[in-house]
């Protein structure tokens, strides 16, 4: 897997979690610093990605980077690289593009930092599916939300996914937007999409709100 660069986006505003914590009168912590079995969410996501066998793992920071850097400082792995958005107030596509521009590989594994419940096994499946596809340079292997296998629509889809760097370089510079509209544009313009099934329902969960965090904790407790 040395030909794979992982990009983890960790540059968002954390707006919904901040509001949830305020409403619940819980002391503020960045959602990526909340802990799962004593491990910060961000660290767990990074560990799952590194264990998938990638050659490098780029974490792209923007908003609230000062809160996340101490977590990253605790990770001792030469494959980990920290990238900073030049402008913090950008869309997700621009954060992802900043990561792509700093990669050293032909293929990219793209993951959101608030997806600690996506297992290493599922991430490996995304990579294996891409590399073994008939057209790896024109294919996106993506965690399926509804349909699995060959996809005709990107509705509801987002990270994690794996694809050739050139696909991202073709589409990301064209639109400063959230990711799903760009994925839908890719599929309209002939990029092949293959939906990989999840192993557990919780893998489909991004930790955006405090209830999401509690669901992840409950799932892990019952494992």
Model-derived segments and their meaning:
Residues 1-26:
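N-terminal nucleotide-binding beta1-loop-alpha1 segment
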Residues 44, 94-98, 125, 129, ...:
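Alpha-helical elements of Rossmann-like donor-binding domains used by nucleotide-donor carbohydrate transfer enzymes
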Residues 68, 117-211:
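Conserved core of the sugar-phosphate nucleotidyltransferase
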Residues 106-114:
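Short beta-strand-to-loop acidic/aromatic patch adjacent to the donor-nucleotide binding site
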Residues 205-223:
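Short, basic/aromatic-enriched C-terminal tail that caps enzymatic domains
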């Amino acid at each position: 897997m040395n030909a794979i660069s992982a990009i983890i986006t960790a540059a968002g505003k954390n707006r919904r979690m901040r509001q949830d914590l305020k409403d619940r009168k819980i002391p503020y912590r960045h959602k990526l610093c909340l802990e799962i079995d004593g491990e910060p969410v961000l660290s767990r996501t990074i560990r799952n990605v590194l264990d998938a066998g990638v050659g490098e793992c780029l974490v792209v920071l923007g908003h609230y980077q000062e809160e996340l850097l101490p977590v990253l400082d605790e990770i001792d792995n030469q494959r980990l690289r920290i990238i900073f958005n030049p402008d913090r107030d950008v869309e997700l596509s621009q954060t992802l593009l900043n990561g792509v521009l700093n990669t050293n590989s032909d293929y990219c594994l793209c993951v959101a930092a608030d997806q600690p419940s996506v297992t290493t096994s599922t991430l490996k499946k995304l990579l294996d599916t891409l590399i073994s596809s008939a057209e790896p340079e024109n294919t996106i292997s993506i965690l399926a939300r509804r349909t699995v296998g060959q996809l005709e629509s990107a509705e509801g889809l987002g990270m994690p996914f794996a694809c050739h760097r050139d696909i991202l370089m073709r589409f990301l510079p064209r639109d400063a937007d959230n990711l799903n509209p760009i994925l839908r544009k890719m599929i309209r313009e002939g990029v092949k999409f293959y939906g990989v099934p999840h192993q557990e329902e919780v893998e489909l969960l991004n930790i955006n709100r405090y209830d999401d965090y509690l669901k992840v904790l409950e799932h892990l407790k019952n494992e």
